[in-house]
Amino acid sequence: MDITEKVELIERPPTEEVVTHDELVELFKTNSSPKHYIGLEISGFLHLGSLISTGFKINDFVKAGVKCTVFLADWHTLINDKLGGDWEMISKVSKYYQDAFKLVCPKANIILGSDLYQEKTEYWSELVKFTKHVSL
């Protein structure tokens, strides 16, 4: 796929804005497989429309040769008291998001925030509890 085709794929709907077309072209001239990241807070059950529009756009990026990562921010969900701040519920819904994105975007890298900190889960849990009771 040439650069023009890659750029057209990325710019097609539902994309509403690209910082600049020229920067995107230049990016592909200098890097044949740039990285893309999208982060999502687990604020409730995943809406099908959100999964489809986000997932299809991620797939456009992948087809254009972009390495995509979907970061599912389960710790942010806890910090922001979403899903009642119930870690068990957050974990279940996060797994649901993970499975859904793996199904729709099989070539994207799906990462849970808790996967990044699994060796220090107790530390992060205590830190989050502490910081939620402190203000500056």
Functional labels for PLM-detected ranges:
Residues 48-70:
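Histidine-anchored nucleotide/phosphate-binding helix
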Residues 80, 87-136:
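Divalent-metal (Mg2+/Mn2+/Ca2+)-assisted nucleotide/phosphate chemistry catalytic cores
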Residues 1-43:
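Non-catalytic terminal extensions that flank enzyme cores
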Residues 37, 69-75, 112-113:
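Core alpha/beta catalytic barrel or barrel-like domain that forms the active/cofactor pocket
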Residues 52-55, 82-87:
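Glycine-rich loop at the start of a catalytic domain that most often binds anionic cofactors/ligands
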Residues 24, 58-66, 93-98:
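Structured alpha-helical segments in the cores of large, soluble enzyme domains
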Residues 42, 74-77, 116:
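Active-site-proximal loop/turn and secondary-structure-junction residues that shape catalytic pockets
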Residues 72-85:
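Short connector loops at secondary-structure junctions
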